Structures are given as structure tokens and as C-alpha cells.
Regions:
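C-terminal accessory module of base-excision DNA glycosylases/AP lyases that mediates lesion recognition
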Residues: 36, 60, 75-145
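Alpha-helical ds-nucleic-acid-binding substructure associated with the helix-hairpin-helix region
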Residues: 1-71, 122
């Protein structure tokens, strides 16, 4: 969907997204709810309520807390934005199915929440690297791959 948005809709800036016809957004594969949420988020960024500069200055958990105030953005989405868009080094999302599957493959069993939290502390400040490794394991990769 992101590829179609970039190819068919032009720059994905808040101002430009607000200028697009709602049905053009839908035609890129977005549900009505997602198209509406994207427009609402664009409004909040365009009117200055959301400042990308501020997001870069906040701690990781503060970024997640701020992002989940956007309609349609839950904790997992906020963590993925924190990891991939903001490029943070210490994001380990236990809400991610791939990460949980990687942990199961690594430990041979599902981990409890307490065990996952201990792992988060041990992986810090390199939680994002741990995330990439666990996704690799979940997709069938191994230590020697």
C-alpha cells in the first residue's frame, strides 16, 4: 500500500495528503477507516499539534504514548514507527507476533511476560538489534545464516 501511495499520490506530507481526494486514498488499498485515520493524523501534523521535531526529542516510551493518541495507532504501530521511522536503537516489541515466534524458536517454548521483561532489560540499549535478530529467527533463519 505504501508503494502505491508514493507512486500514485505524490509526496506523503501532511499538507499534500489533506489535498487528496478521499476516494484516491481508498483506491490505493486503504480501508475507509484507515484513510480517515491518515487524514486525521495529517490534520494534527499540519496544524502543529504533532511536531516531528518533538518526537525526535522524546524518550522512546514517550514517543509511543504520544503516537497512540492518534486515531488508528495502537502500541504495536507506535513501536514500529519508533523503530523504523525514528530509527531508535532500543525498541523490542513483545506485541509483535514475529518477535514472540523468534523467542519461542530461541528458547524452545513461549516466554512469560516477566521473562520477556527481563529479556528487554538485558537487551537494552540494543533492543532494536534484538528485534531484527528475532524476526530473522522467526522467518526460519538461524545463528549461522
Amino acid at each position: 500500500i505504501m508503494g502505491r501511495l508514493r507512486q500514485n499520490c505524490g509526496p506523503l506530507t501532511p499538507e499534500h495528503l489533506l489535498s487528496l481526494d478521499f476516494e484516491l486514498l481508498r483506491a490505493q488499498g486503504l480501508s475507509a477507516h484507515k484513510a480517515k485515520w491518515i487524514r486525521r493524523a495529517a490534520e494534527r501534523f499540519a496544524d502543529g499539534e504533532f511536531d516531528t521535531g518533538l518526537l525526535h526529542r522524546l524518550e522512546d516510551e514517550e514517543v509511543v504514548e504520544k503516537l497512540v493518541t492518534l486515531d488508528g495507532v495502537g502500541r504495536w504501530t507506535a513501536e514500529m514507527i519508533t523503530l523504523f521511522t525514528l530509527g531508535r536503537d532500543d525498541v523490542l516489541s513483545f506485541g509483535d507476533l514475529g518477535i514472540r515466534r523468534g523467542l519461542e524458536r530461541l528458547y524452545g517454548r513461549p516466554l512469560t511476560k516477566a521473562e520477556m521483561e527481563r529479556l528487554r532489560r538485558r537487551a537494552s540499549p540494543f533492543g532494536s538489534a534484538a528485534s531484527l535478530y528475532l524476526w530473522h529467527l522467526a522467518s526460519g533463519g538461524g545463528v549461522a545464516d
